[in-house]
Amino acid sequence: MDIPQGGVIMNHFALALRGLNCMGCARKLERQLNQDLTVEIETLTPTSIELHTHATLNEVLTSIESLGYQGGTEQTYQLQGLNCGRCVNKLTTHLSAQAEIAKLHVSKERLSLVTTLTAEQVKALVAEVGYQAIEAEQESTFAPAASIDEKETDTPDAENSSNTEATEASSQTLSLLIKGMTCASCVASVEKALLSVEGVQSAQVNLTEQSALVRGIFANPQPLLNAIQSSGYQAEILDDPAQQQAKQQAQLEALQKEHKQSALLGIALGTPLMLWGVFGGNMMIRNSSDQMVWGGIGTICFALLLTAGRHFFMNAWQALTHGRATMDTLVALGTGAAWFYSMLVVAWPQTFPDAARHVYFEATAMIIGLISLGHYIETKAKSNTNRSLQALLNLQPQQATLVTEQGDQSIAVADIQLGMSLRIKPGEQVPVDGVVSTGHSYLDESMLTGEPIPVLKEAGAKVAAGTLNQDGSLVITATGIGAQTMLARIIQMVRQAQSSKPAMARLADQISSVFVPVVVVIAILSAALWYLYGPDPKASYMLVVATTVLIIACPCALGLATPLSITVGIGKAAEMGILIRDANVLQTASQVDTVVFDKTGTLTLGKPSIQSLHVLQGDENQLLALAYALEQQSEHPLAKAICDYAKQRNISPVEISQFTNQRGRGLLADYQNQTVLVGSLAFMQEQGIDLSMAESTLEKFAAQAWTPVAVAYRGMLQGVLAIADPIKPTSAQAVRKLNELGIHTVMLTGDHTSVANAIAKELGISQVIAQVLPDQKAQHIQALQQQGRKVAMIGDGINDAPALALADIGIAMGSGSDVAIESAQMTLLNSSPTSVVSAIELSKATLRNMKQNLFGAFIYNTLGIPIAAGVLYPAFGFLLSPVVAGAAMALSSITVVSNANRLRWSKISFDQHSQ
């Protein structure tokens, strides 16, 4: 908003600030602004500034950035309606005229800017020239913030990108908390409602968490809420993972309380009635006194239906008005029919044959009580399935210590800005992602990576939110806050995976969606058959059979069979430092029979180091000083190993001149007017250096797959350094266990065959494919698949990305490149090969658990419904009681939930949590 000041219009800006650590920084900024511009500052803190100035926003931001700080709010939008370059120019001209907008970039599909305007104001400005802007939120994935920024930044070629790419890049993922779902039929209804909304690309509804993840392009999320409401449910959007978890927990606790009260009321009333009948008490209406007594009991039972059973009837009615049937429909029909029949008998006994004047009030009460008890136990168990996610959320502290010029200050984690300096004291958890600026300490990263050994952190080392500082004190600079911390991305990835569904689960959902209507039809047909062909009293038998069929059928068990197993399995994987992108991975990983390892960074540490030093002339220090002098000017991967080794030995490089790098062969330079050579054996031979004196040493190096780097001076070989990429301590364990499981192991590497074979022999790898160019790795994966193998590829580099994407399962090391991680369906945060074994075993255990749950649910319903319909009566005279049916229904759900939670205690190799 512009205001007049001394007769001159001045601009008013309220800007967010980043990079300022204290009020000293703020005062420094104030001096810079007054030096560069004419400003009147109203308020100034390390995180915000409000000022009046004649300058434009661009000029203000330039002044702020001259000190290394950042100001303003970055906003990104997906654009619709721009068809050509003229449209882009039109919008650019219109927005450029706004003083509150800076750093503007417009393409046909995308708008990015820094502004003091709100999102609604920006959308309104875009609408003024006939276009539409939609806020673009990149889907959270396990990738560093920098890589996300790179993906979202437009390039000059952005206009030529396909519409598909633009759509995918701008997709939002919204988390919804849903209230009112009770069974798989509800899940199907909610998914159908969400998918009917324009712009929705996918919808994943989770019965266990009472939540939904919706992906698509939304100008306004309100239609999603309207669609759910029109289906008879309630929903709200939750962006904050901690808030979502808290609300889900509160919802579960409220349901527990409701089910507990209903169970107590139902069982308290039903138990004496049932015992009265069991021990020979009269439950027939024979005279007026029976009518009075049972009429009173019927009234009490009606009150029970209005209180403890109220939610069954309300949910059933709501489902009916929306043209569907749910588990509540079955309970409401069964208990309602039993009560209504009994009241008819009480009111007009003369209309029924003597043998049919039996009342079933005990069935009404006990069914409500037992099913509510089952729901209570089930809901309590559900809250345990989210324990892994809650543990992740609990890792981030609420307060942090901000380092300022005035001393340390306590600050809320939500108020931390990028660039702030934070002190991490012994025993404290790291509040945000950052880089260590001063201090050193060991950090326990086991809660994120599953790796129990603390990791040393010194200046320059990266730290992640949620890790635990041990005995030292650190000062870190915040580099990732809020949703961009590794912890937040892990939580989002786990939540998405838990809401996804493998093929087996989708099949179960399809069956569940038609289950209730089929059961209602079976109940009606059974009642008709008993009425037509059953013994007297027909009406009584008809009621018992129909009620029992309705009550015993349990879509709840079917609906929970797979989501619970997935939630527990993926949660356990997260505890072990294994991130799973989609639940389908569990099903595929359980079928893997071939594991392909990249070598560098996967089986090895990816950090070449000196393994041995053989001196022929002079001493070690002179040899290292010569090698260090040349290698410090090289970019070769092995050069760093030599330089680091020399630094560790406190060796100083000699002064050289005339440095020459013969790329891929070796290095030359002059030292004291004599030539120094450092490089490969082939390079030495080209330069006429005699290697025969080191022949036995070189053979020894070759046998151990060490790479020799020779050093020559004055035309004579001075010595040889052996360099190798050390094998990870856990690689041999992983390969040995995979071989025990009958899984074929393969090493796929670009390294020399001799080196690859030596490492494969040491580790016990079955097959070696060496000297493979980066673009050929995917071809070798395809060749293995053509042999009928189910292939898992494990890699960490950019060159592994195509192979990771092509494999049946792509597994990326958490220490690897962002491209590799994005191409994989699974990420190992601890970068340990043993986690591959754990992931495969856990996938098999989860799939086995899902099959057990589905088998149990199907068998229960397949046997229970016919028995309830009375198929055993002609041969054995046995007819199931509605009360027993209610108990069986409750027990089936409890069994499924308990079996899913049993997965938490499965013995998985190399799992520190189960040792």
UniProtKB/Swiss-Prot annotation:
EC numbers, comma separated: 7.2.2.8
Subcellular location: Cell membrane
Gene Ontology biological process: copper ion homeostasis
Keywords: ATP-binding, Cell membrane, Copper, Copper transport, Ion transport, Magnesium, Membrane, Metal-binding, Nucleotide-binding, Phosphoprotein, Repeat, Translocase, Transmembrane, Transmembrane helix, Transport
GO molecular-function term, one example from the UniProt record: ATP binding
Region (Disordered): 142-169
Residue intervals passing through the bilayer: 265-285, 293-313, 329-349, 359-379, 474-494, 514-534, 541-561, 801-821, 865-885
Biased composition (Polar residues): 158-169
Residues annotated for Cu(+) 3 binding in this entry: C183, C186
Matches recorded under Pfam families: E1-E2_ATPase, HMA, Hydrolase
InterPro entries (alphabetical): ATPase_P-typ_cyto_dom_N, ATPase_P-typ_P_site, ATPase_P-typ_TM_dom_sf, ATPase_P-typ_transduc_dom_A_sf, HAD-like_sf, HAD_sf, Heavy-metal-associated_CS, HMA_dom
Keyword Ligase listed: no
Membrane topology, record value: Multi-pass membrane protein
Primary localization class, coarse: membrane
Residues where Mg(2+) binds: D796, D800
Catalyzed reaction equations: Cu(+)(in) + ATP + H2O = Cu(+)(out) + ADP + phosphate + H(+)
Active site: D598
CDD domains named in the record: HMA (cd00371), P-type_ATPase_Cu-like (cd02094)
Annotated binding of Cu(+) 2, by residue: C84, C87
List of residues binding Cu(+) 1: C22, C25
Ranges for domain HMA: 11-72, 73-134, 172-236
PANTHER family: ATP7, ISOFORM B, COPPER-EXPORTING P-TYPE ATPASE
Function (record text): Involved in copper export.
Similarity comment: Belongs to the cation transport ATPase (P-type) (TC 3.A.3) family. Type IB subfamily.
Record-given protein name: Copper-exporting P-type ATPase
Gene: copA
